[in-house]
Amino acid sequence: MTSKPNFLIIMVDQLNGTFFPDGPADWLHTPNLRRLASNSVRFKNAYTASPLCAPGRASFMSGQLPSQNGVYDNAAEFSSTIPTYAHHLRRAGYQTCLSGKMHFVGPDQLHGFEERLTTDIYPADFGWTPDYSKPDERIDWWYHNLGSVTGAGIGEISNQLEYDDEVAFNAKS
């Protein structure tokens, strides 16, 4: 009997592809990512169907454009009736697990995955949809400029540290 290959899908937000011509750029200190990339199959000509995170993830998971799956912004529900690669992997006998943010809107927070190791950093909801008739109340002040980077200062906690703590807490022996 032939064993199935294991694989790990890593999806990141807002990462410029020029950082990875043949692995992480030399000036980036990413020893673990560099080691992982050197022993992996990588998609060098990947394409995202949307520059927004939730529609991009829904398209990647479903193989459908936002116009087909209805996830056109970060507040749109990703219908549980749409099969994802996780459904297909489970049908092929794989064990599936999700960790990290997905911003799934709606009751289905797994979309074919058997388990989820971490909660979402902030579930998407209709509050993510800006009201363009009220520009002073929009949430995009932190999303479309470098203010959150240049004004950040020294951090005491990060989403990564919170995820690491949660994974350690929920680790199965």
Model-derived features with residue positions:
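Formylglycine-dependent sulfatase
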Residues: 1-173
